[in-house]
């Protein structure tokens, strides 16, 4: 029977409800911490929790926290937020992109990773299968030595390139997926290298209906999006609210173009809210409430004007598609 794995246990697909598919809730990325980039440190549990409560008060039910081991997870804090707010939170095993790996591994992780100074040294030293075993344990036993298990496995690649170490983690994540049946999520830098990621996953025998590709709206190319969608993978439009990259009209146009081509069952929506200045209760940003309270009504209006049923599409993007995408299909 299919199920969703959250930080507080496995639930049925029907329990997931309205879902943001790619967020960050509490994290202290070592790479940014070492460089004094305070805006990228979501380091106050109570402030993060207040934003999660805003999301809940507007009808939100679940959040996928896409924070991997190399991005400074605080598993305990995020699990406590899930319990205290009543929101389902899906945790993430695996890895991010390689430029983050110059950072030092925190001491409390070394019993799990080994005594390596940096993430790059660890990943280089281990075999693909050893890295896969690490990811499998995060899904089946718990994240970072806690009893709280990951509900998806993740890898990442860089801008217009895939380094040898990134390919190594991709293959490790693919093998962990085969062992656990966990859904796979990928970081694409500025929406690039998705097709190359897909080719590598296919070489590992991955069925692409298990895959969601992040940051698709950062590369606003309808032809490229159609090529990706035709593989059967899910596409995450997770830059909602980030007008510095593109206006909302651009994202909505890209999404509706995929709907016109018949790919509405493969679209996921979120905000990738990973800075203090994006959060309402850290620094007066739009906050986690923005998509559900402001963007959704606008999308419904634009979709209806274009001849679609906007409400039906919202139900797909935020409820039925996440329930399918993030399922363990046993």
Could you tell me what each predicted segment is?
Residues 184-185, 237-240, 263-285:
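Short acidic/histidine-rich active-site segments
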Residues 17-26, 34-88, 128-148:
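Alpha-helical scaffold segments that flank or form the walls of functional sites
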Residues 22, 63, 177, 235, ...:
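Divalent metal-coordination and catalytic microenvironments
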Residues 2-9, 290-330:
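Mid-to-C-terminal alpha-helical segments outside catalytic/metal-binding sites
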């Amino acid at each position: 029977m299919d199920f969703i794995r959250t930080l507080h246990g496995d639930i049925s697909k029907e329990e997931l409800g309205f879902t943001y598919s790619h967020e960050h809730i509490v994290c202290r990325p070592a790479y940014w911490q070492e460089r004094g980039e305070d805006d990228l440190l979501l380091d106050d549990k109570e402030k993060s929790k207040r934003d999660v409560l805003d999301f809940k008060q507007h009808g939100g039910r679940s959040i996928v926290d896409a924070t991997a081991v190399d991005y400074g997870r605080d598993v305990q804090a995020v699990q406590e937020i899930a319990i205290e707010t009543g929101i389902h939170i899906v945790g993430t095993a695996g890895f991010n992109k390689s430029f983050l790996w110059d950072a030092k591994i925190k001491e409390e992780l070394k019993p799990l990773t080994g005594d390596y100074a940096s993430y790059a040294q660890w990943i280089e030293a281990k075999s693909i299968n050893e890295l896969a075993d690490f990811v499998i344990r995060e899904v089946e036993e718990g994240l970072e030595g806690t009893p709280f298990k990951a509900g998806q496995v993740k890898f990442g690649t860089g801008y217009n390139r895939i380094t040898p170490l990134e390919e190594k983690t991709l293959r490790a994540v693919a093998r962990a997926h085969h062992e656990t049946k966990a859904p796979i999520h990928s970081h694409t830098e500025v929406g690039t290298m998705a097709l190359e990621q897909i080719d590598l996953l296919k070489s590992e025998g991955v069925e692409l209906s298990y895959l969601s590709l992040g940051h698709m709206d950062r590369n606003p190319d309808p032809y490229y999006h159609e090529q990706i969608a035709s593989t059967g993978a899910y596409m995450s439009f997770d830059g909602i609210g980030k007008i510095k990259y593109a206006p909302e009209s651009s994202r909505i146009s890209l999404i509706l173009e995929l709907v016109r081509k018949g790919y509405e069952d493969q679209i996921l929506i979120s905000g990738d809210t990973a800075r203090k200045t994006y959060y309402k209760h850290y620094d007066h940003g739009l906050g986690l409430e923005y998509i559900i309270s402001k963007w959704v009504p606008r999308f419904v209006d634009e979709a209806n004007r274009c001849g679609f049923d906007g409400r039906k599409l919202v139900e797909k993007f935020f409820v039925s598609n996440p329930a399918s995408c993030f399922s363990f299909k046993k």
